[in-house]
Amino acid sequence: MASFSLPHSATYFPSHSETSLKPHSAASFTVRCTSASPAVPPQTPQKPRRSPDENIRDEARRRPHQLQNLSARYVPFNAPPSSTESYSLDEIVYRSQSGALLDVQHDFAALKRYDGEFWRNLFDSRVGKTNWPYGSGVWSKKEWVLPEIDDDDIVSAFEGNSNLFWAERFGKQYLQMNDLWVKHCGISHTGSFKDLGMSVLVSQVNRLRKMNKPVIGVGCASTGDTSAALSAYCASAGIPSIVFLPADKISMAQLVQPIANGAFVLSIDTDFDGCMHLIREVTAELPIYLANSLNSLRLEGQKTAAIEILQQFNWQVPDWVIVPGGNLGNIYAFYKGFHMCKELGLVDRIPRLVCAQAANANPLYLHYKSGFKEDFNPLKANTTFASAIQIGDPVSIDRAVYALKKSNGIVEEATEEELMDATALADSTGMFICPHTGVALTALMKLRKSGVIGANDRTVVVSTAHGLKFTQSKIDYHSKNIKEMACRLANPPVKVKAKFGSVMDVLKEYLKSNDK
């Protein structure tokens, strides 16, 4: 078609090729000249609405499964090729015979019957829909998560599909970066990325209970976000939830969530590592299913955030992805999601990963600085504003090391002052982030300053929770109420008398200071 300038009365209509879900193809357009009257969009056939007495689960039962003969099993994590040890996902098992972590292994031979274009088109076709269960960002990748679970057993709040936004001002003004993005996993059902994994875990528990497996309730140790997700998804399914929390070490916003959702909450006089030790002992004795990231099912949901990032970039691979790390399951989950996409032909490479830790809880950072040559040494985590990653003995240390080695990854740390300043700086550009994202941004700033991350590198910072869960830390910072911290970016309210002249004086001074 010859190109030419269009009059104002011309209307663009996507051609058939644009709407056929073919990735990497440039959009082509048909141009129709119209009269001055308002353009009438082309009529598309509407999907018939289901009958009033039918819900979306009923509708899903009538829909045949698109793909057959896909499966997944538990296997020992990073086992040698000669290993034959494996377990059905319907077994209640958390570790291998040797005590090693487990991993969910998918049947790649079956998945490879379909090429990368097929998977890209399938996943893209489900975005923005309300078909059960594909309206979820997790379950829109069901074939790569729990391929054998019945749709009726799935417990979902249509989590995932979280915002990936361009951090334009922060990137340009403070880092001289043009391509900085934030994947805001905190925009989710309970306000953190933990929803992704908990939907998968509670769905499998729902299936196990229907199979009369010995599961009365689900339990977890938590620094806040895990308990919020567990209690919400269990409440949705009518399954009892039991939560072990370290006393006086999480925010009130985090504490109120499991309480409101009806969880049985134990506030225990210890830290997270102590709670984790106790819940593992308890679940070994009682019919309580363990929901911590020792359980590899959670990571199957969390890996979908990595797939979403690729999808949101039209299947182009970013150069860097920076993930806050505490118990360290999430850094491995991101690696696994990227690796599956490469292995199955959706992309041709994976990004480099950065795990960001608080300096007050930095066992992985210290292990990394040793070149991973020395034996890993857990430590006693000190108090950090990034409370969800205040963990000194991470369960997934082996998974994290594996992911970092495979992705040519880096580990960086942030002091309390650095993470709070980074949080305040990001907030001043229109974000409202959690302290853990402040840790990740600090890592980015250090790597940018050292030249490891370039000005033109497409970089994604993973924001793991919503800032509204951590308002007290923001209040303390802007009130300059944090001991031994300058709070140099504090923005406290200005007290002024209720007089026009007083208000005008203050405003003139403010405007003068900003007129630079």
Curated annotation (Swiss-Prot):
Compositionally biased region (Polar residues): 1-37
Keyword Chloroplast: yes
Keywords, ordered alphabetically: Allosteric enzyme, Amino-acid biosynthesis, Chloroplast, Lyase, Plastid, Pyridoxal phosphate, S-adenosyl-L-methionine, Threonine biosynthesis, Transit peptide
Binding positions for S-adenosyl-L-methionine 1 per the UniProt entry: P133, Y134, G135, S156, A157, F158
Transit peptide: 1-33
E.C. number: 4.2.3.1
EC main group: lyase
Role summary: Catalyzes the gamma-elimination of phosphate from L-phosphohomoserine and the beta-addition of water to produce L-threonine.
Protein name: Threonine synthase 2, chloroplastic
Organism from which the protein derives: Arabidopsis thaliana (Mouse-ear cress)
Originating gene: TS2
